[in-house]
């Protein structure tokens, strides 16, 4: 149903950064959760009859290249929601298995899955929460996205001043600039 998978130049950069900063178990946690999340989207898109052209690993993560323009707003909402729902359902199952076997790796995997899913529900482009908001209220989505990105930048700067690192501030800055440019 799709032509294949490719890694864009930005995807190689993302892989390099992840490999530099993460150990192998952490890399497996990130890759596994992203895979489960994207499989949720693929499952729903296929149920909706959408042709998947390809999967592309870019600088912003794994992207499904397809034409959703023919989907109704309700169906677009469901396709956007499917990724986070798969992630949360998987996290619940993996968490139960981790607790039963007292397996710290499975608990870490489950926790990362919840974080990825909740983060993806934020109403800021290009995340799934934005796609859901755009499907529900198309006129408001760009404004809510920009305000959310600005809020992330302000919170990130506050966290940075308080000594909690620069990651959230840079993420907020990226999202603000992405909305403006």
Where in the sequence are the language-model features?
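Hydrophobic transmembrane alpha-helices and their immediate loop junctions
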Residues: 1-181
């Amino acid at each position: 149903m799709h032509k294949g998978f490719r890694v864009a130049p930005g995807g190689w950069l993302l892989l390099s950064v992840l490999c530099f900063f993460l150990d192998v178990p952490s890399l497996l946690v990130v890759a596994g959760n992203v895979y489960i999340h994207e499989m949720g989207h693929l499952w729903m898109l296929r149920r909706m009859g959408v042709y998947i052209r390809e999967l592309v690993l870019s600088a912003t993560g794994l992207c499904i290249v397809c034409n959703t323009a023919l989907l109704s707003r309700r169906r677009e909402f469901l396709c956007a929601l499917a990724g986070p729902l798969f992630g949360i359902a998987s996290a619940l199952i993996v968490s139960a298995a981790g607790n039963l076997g007292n397996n710290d790796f499975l608990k870490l995997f489950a926790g990362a899955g919840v974080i990825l899913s909740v983060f993806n529900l934020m109403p800021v482009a290009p995340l799934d929460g934005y796609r859901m908001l755009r499907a529900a209220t198309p006129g408001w989505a760009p404004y809510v996205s920009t305000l959310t990105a600005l809020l992330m930048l302000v919170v990130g700067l506050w966290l940075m001043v308080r000594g909690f690192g620069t990651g959230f501030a840079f993420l907020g800055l990226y999202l603000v600039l992405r909305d403006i440019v």
